[in-house]
Structures are given as structure tokens and as C-alpha cells.
């Protein structure tokens, strides 16, 4: 190795350490380079402001007037020993006359020792914080730290010095972005200057409070909820306009504070004005959030959290009345928009055709409408229940049948009669009457007639040969075209003429989806030869040969008896 390269010059830090302790250059294991002054001049381009620490004689010649020897470093660094308390430092430390031993120094805090850190150590961790216990001590920052801070600031980063709490809890890096106030909104609070804060917080709310705002900013405590406020509702003000609701809601999770079950932004004519409402399950949760979020800084704006105030009784009643009126208007709109069908026969009618009892009443009324005898009325006497009589009256009104209520109390009965004028099958129109039970020729098949082994032509031949159709209207030649006229179509359950004119003819298909209807003569499984079906044109005729005498219909009408009124040609409803 070349001569002069085996010795390395002492760095400024090494010289500072040696000058403040008992070690001397003679006893030091490090040898001094003879050309230290020239090397310092070469390094002056890299560390021009650190040359004053070397105390060379050539610096005095340049007019810096820096005293040489160890007295300069003693005066410069010796005063740090006054900032360390005797309880925290066991040796003389830097600037002291005693011998410093690494073996005697404690690496950590012992059991039962206080977590109050020395003020000088807190200054080293956070030079921006001034010491409250020693007003004469000012925050000092070395030139190297200043150079680092200037470099990081020019690069777009902010150098955040670790606080005492960060050292104890080992929380996160020291360098953050320019929006560090969003992640660490309370970095500057010196929470450990007071003895009352000597303990380490263990809850989220106390952690957020301990990392509070700087001492230069003082916020008043949020008011306690009173009788005019809602204890479980808060109002968050001064929210940044560009901050989304989802991002603000994540702040609750980041701070580990209770999250609201209802959280909404308030928009003024569609524009967000920095106001939000939050509701909580208990007053304790709301109080915790108010204490933590009040003064929380987000992108340079401090939130203001207050309790939500109740409206005056008169104003509250006016708002509630407006809500009820709006709800009533919406219900009326929905009723007008809803189509007329079996599910909603009427807005005030609450019966279900799937109910067996109601379906039985409906079947008897429908068979009464399709009667083949001279029965003029159908009576629902006192043997029926009140609900059945009510349903019978409602169904009769929907079927355009006349009904009347006679008697009082237990003897009350509902009498249903045919209207004075009703249509004739010859003038039948699908626009005015719903073909409830009248299938056309295309939908009538042998399987629906109970004769699965007969095709439609053979069925027509069988009906024509059995003498069922003696009228010229139902001749064998026009059987297929007039096949849908065998039965009288059911009346339509339509609304009044004034309302029906607005809806058009859509109600003609209102009850076309009903399949649970009683059997008719053509749908019985009995042999067709035993039936004697009359023409609907001769319904009012008195000829007894035109009546239905099928076995199934005879079984049905055999159980009918005259009504209590004694009128001839009436029948009474009986339960099956």
C-alpha cells in the first residue's frame, strides 16, 4: 500500500466525540493524517459549511475567527448536558467530564420507569417542537439536517420528524407526502410535555387526541348535547368540496372510531356545500366521534362537528304534514297507474279468489248468471257468514247483477237478481263482454271435453248426429263457425262508463286468465248423448224441453230450495 494511504482523516463527528471525552489523539486507535488540512480543502466542495467544525488554523487566516483546540467544541456541545435530567442520564454524556461507558448505559426503559422522555431527546426526534420546561433551550437543527430538509422539500416531499409516541409505538416512516395531514392530522401536538400524558394511550380515540394539533392552534371543546339537540345525530361541517363521501367514511375506519349506520351528504340544489349528517346507535358513539373528528384536518381544512339540533314543534309538524301529503299523492298515482285485473278488482275490495270459500261464492253467482231455468234471484241467507254475504254483494256489483240486502241482525240476507235489460247472444261483442267461459273453435279440443279418443271432426259429427242442435243456426255446415256461441259469454267486470272511456277496451281481457271455474255442460265427462242443450235465443221461452236436464246439472239444482221470501222461481245459496 502506498505511503500516506494507511491513515484516514478524522471526520467532524469523530473529532467532536474525541474532544468531549477523555480520549486523546495519543490514546485513540485512529491515527491522524498529516495532510488533514489539504484533504479538508478537497472536501470543501462537498461540505463547505462543515469546515468550521474542524477548527483548523487556516480557517482563522481566512477571517472566520474560530478558536482552535477543544475549547470551541466544548462550548458548542457542552451545554447539551444541562438539558438531560439526572434521572434519565446516568453518565456525564456529551460535554461532561466523566468517563462515558457503553457497558453502563441502559438500552431500554426499565420496569416501572417513567415514559417521559428527556427534552433533548424529544428535540432530536422532533426539532420543530420547543421545550416547555426549559424556555432558554431553542430547537437546534444541524446543517446536515437542514440540507436534507431542503433537498426533500425541493423534491416534493415533506420530512416529518418522528415524535416520541412514534418511537415508543414504532409507527410508520418519517417521510410522507405533502398531504400528510390527511394521514397524520395531529402530528405536531406535544402530547408528552405534561405529566398527565405520561401513559401510552391504548384506545383509538385517545391515540387520535394525543396526536392532536399544534400548540399554536387552540380549538374549543365541542358543546355537550342539550335538550334541543339529538344525542345520536351529528352534523359535520367544513368538508372539502372535492372529498367524496366514501373517502370521508373511510376516515372513520382509519381512526377506529364508531361508524354511523346512516351517513349522507347534504346537497343544496344539487350542489355539495361541505355539510354531512351522521346517525349513530347510541349517544356514547356519537360523543366519541365528536371528540375525535372536531378539528380533524383534511387537505388543509379542519372539520367542525356539532350536534344536530331539533326543529321547533311547529316546524316539525309542518315538515311531517308535508311528508304525509307527498306520500298520499304518490299512493294515488300508483293506484291510477295499476292495471285492472283479478289481483286488484278494486282499491277498496280486499278478497282473494284463491280462497275456497270466496271461490265457492263466485262459482254459485257465475252459475246463477248461466242459469237455464226461470230462477229470478239467488239468496244468501243467514246460514252464510257475514264475509260470504259481503263478497257476494261485491261480486254481484262487478258482474252487473242487481243485489239488495234485506233483514236485520242475524236474519240479514243478500238477494241477487238479474238486471232488467241484458244482452242477447246474437248481438254479442267481445268489446263489451269478456269471454270468461266461452272458448272459440281453435281452443276447444277433445281433451277439454273429456273425450281424448275423438278428433274434432268426429266430435262434430257425433254432436250433429245426436240431435243436440235442432236450430238452423247451429247446422252441421256452420258448426265450426258457430261453435263459440254454444254458451253465453260471461259479463265483463268493468268500471263505470266515465272511467272505462279513459281506459279504452283493455278491460275486456281482465278475467281471461281465470281457470278455476265450475264445469259447464260441454265440459262434463258424461256422454254427450244424454245432454239436451237448448239455444241461448230460447232462454226466456217457457218450453220445458229447452231446459238443461243433464245429470250433473240435475244434481246441482236438486239441492236448491225456494227462498225465505216465498217468491216463486228463486233459489237459496247453500254451502258445499
UniProtKB/Swiss-Prot annotation:
What are the subcellular locations of this protein?
A: Cytoplasm
Q: Start and end of every RRM domain?
A: 232-310
GO MF annotation, one: mRNA binding
The entry's comment on post-translational modification says:
Phosphorylated by sty1.
GO CC list: cytoplasm; cytosol; nucleus; post-mRNA release spliceosomal complex
Keyword Acetylation: yes or no? no
Source superkingdom: Eukaryota
| PROSITE patterns per the UniProt record, alphabetical | R3H, RRM
Q: What is its main location?
A: cytoplasm
The UniProt entry, under InterPro entries, shows: Nucleotide-bd_a/b_plait_sf, PIN4-like_RRM, R3H_Cip2, R3H_dom, R3H_dom_sf, RBD_domain_sf, RRM_dom, RRT5_SRSF_SR
Chain ranges of the R3H domain: 355-420
Q: Which keywords belong to this entry? A: Cytoplasm, Phosphoprotein, Repeat, RNA-binding
What is annotated about its quaternary structure and interactions?
A: Interacts with csx1.
Question: Which PANTHER family does the entry mention?
Answer: RNA RECOGNITION MOTIF RRM DOMAIN CONTAINING PROTEIN, RNA-BINDING PROTEIN PIN4
Query: What does the protein in this record do?
Result: Regulates global gene expression after oxidative stress. Interacts and stabilizes mRNAs and may regulate their transition between different cytoplasmic components after oxidative stress.
Q: What is this protein called?
A: RNA-binding post-transcriptional regulator cip2
Q: Which organism is it from?
A: Schizosaccharomyces pombe (strain 972 / ATCC 24843) (Fission yeast)
